[in-house]
Amino acid sequence: MELHVLNHPLVEHKLTVLRDKNTPSSTFRELVSELVMLEAYEATRNLSVVAAPIETPVAPMTGKKLASPRPIIVPVLRAGLGMLDGMTRLIPTAEVGFLGMKRDEEHPTQQVTYANRLPEDLSGRQCFLIDPMLATGGTLVAATHYLAERGAKDVTAINIIAAPEGIKYVEEHIDPSIDFKVVVCAVDERLNDKCYIVPGLGDAGDRLYGVID
């Protein structure tokens, strides 16, 4: 597993405003989108490209374009949807799949899959899993293996905040045959007894969309 933690003043500034409990949902959503675009720049560094002959107004040249098959972006519902706009603005030609998973509250590292909209065959595809929080690591491992069962071998997770416990769990449980990377804005102190990241930013889904009772 390869872990990349962004180190940039713009990331630190935006993340501080994002964490603030007084930041309204509208601003929170915009900041998530902006942070994801900054993360995606690093996460997409190894996207496959092919030669593309073109003509500029001055002369012919050979540039580069994204190769086929197209990369696929997979938000983990529901909080991952808040990161989708930033990703598709950067890679508008990417395909989008959806994966609904939620943590079993009695067994925090176990997941319940309740929805999926994914191609049956992900062989040869570069996959980007997006979910704001890497807390226990259970969702990320389950989602990655879900993609791997469909043939994915190149998976990059983009999370805004991670907990050390979650990173450790992922390192210990991810299938080593997968080319797996994680890009985060920050690694926080720890998880509390409710498996929330500390200091964290609260429940990302609730802050993006409001609380659903």
From Swiss-Prot:
Cross-referenced InterPro entries: PRibTrfase_dom, PRTase-like, Upp_B, UPRTase/APRTase, Ura_phspho_trans
Reactions catalysed according to its record: UMP + diphosphate = 5-phospho-alpha-D-ribose 1-diphosphate + uracil
Binding site for 5-phospho-alpha-D-ribose 1-diphosphate: R78, R103, D131, P132, M133, L134, A135, T136, G137, G138, T139, D203
Cofactor note: Binds 1 Mg(2+) ion per subunit. The magnesium is bound as Mg-PRPP.
Regulation: Allosterically activated by GTP.
EC number in record: 2.4.2.9
MF GO annotations: GTP binding; magnesium ion binding; uracil phosphoribosyltransferase activity
Chain segments annotated as coiled-coil in the UniProt record: none
SUPFAM superfamilies: PRTase-like
Pathway: Pyrimidine metabolism; UMP biosynthesis via salvage pathway; UMP from uracil: step 1/1
Stored CDD domains: PRTases_typeI
Enzyme class: transferase
Key words of the record: Allosteric enzyme, Glycosyltransferase, GTP-binding, Magnesium, Nucleotide-binding, Transferase
Residues bound to uracil: I197, G202, D203, A204
Biological process according to GO: UMP salvage; uracil salvage
Co-factor requirement: Mg(2+)
Superkingdom of the organism of origin: Bacteria
PANTHER family xrefs: ADENINE PHOSPHORIBOSYLTRANSFERASE, URACIL PHOSPHORIBOSYLTRANSFERASE, CHLOROPLASTIC
Described function: Catalyzes the conversion of uracil and 5-phospho-alpha-D-ribose 1-diphosphate (PRPP) to UMP and diphosphate.
Family: Belongs to the UPRTase family.
Protein name according to UniProt: Uracil phosphoribosyltransferase
